[in-house]
């Protein structure tokens, strides 16, 4: 059983994957984020989520593959601080799950994480699970 608090008035919610399953780039985390409580899995019909490829290296660059249509032009759903928090968290969670599952760094292995940005602007991990290749 997984229990977590209900987040009211969240700034954003999303899914982060510790590799890039969609554009097949090397050395990136894939981030898919919606504004507020609009779900990634079942969004409002006209809502487009923000897609980011985040370099795995701390402080490294990011690419907005697709901007959200729920923010002003030129604005982002995730701040630089949020992306840095996600980068750090993805590295830690992937490493710990890799060890738990007995996978070496040579094995194909990745983690899929659901996250929230709370109304206080803090990253909260809702759940993490291995990506199935």
Regions found by a protein language model. Name each.
Residues 1-133:
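Nucleotide/phosphate-binding sheet-loop regions of phosphoryl- and nucleotidyl-transfer enzymes
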């Amino acid at each position: 059983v997984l229990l977590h608090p209900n987040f009211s008035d969240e700034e954003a919610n999303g899914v982060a994957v510790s590799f890039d399953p969609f554009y097949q780039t090397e050395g990136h985390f894939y981030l898919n984020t919606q504004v507020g409580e609009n779900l990634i899995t079942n969004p409002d019909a006209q809502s487009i989520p923000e897609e980011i490829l985040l370099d795995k290296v701390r402080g490294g660059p990011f690419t907005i593959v697709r901007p959200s249509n729920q923010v002003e032009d030129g604005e982002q759903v995730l701040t630089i601080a949020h992306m840095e928090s996600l980068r750090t968290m993805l590295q830690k969670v992937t490493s710990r799950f890799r060890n738990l599952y007995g996978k070496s760094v040579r094995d194909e292995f990745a983690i899929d994480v659901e996250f929230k940005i709370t109304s206080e602007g803090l990253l909260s991990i809702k759940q993490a699970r291995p990506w199935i290749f």
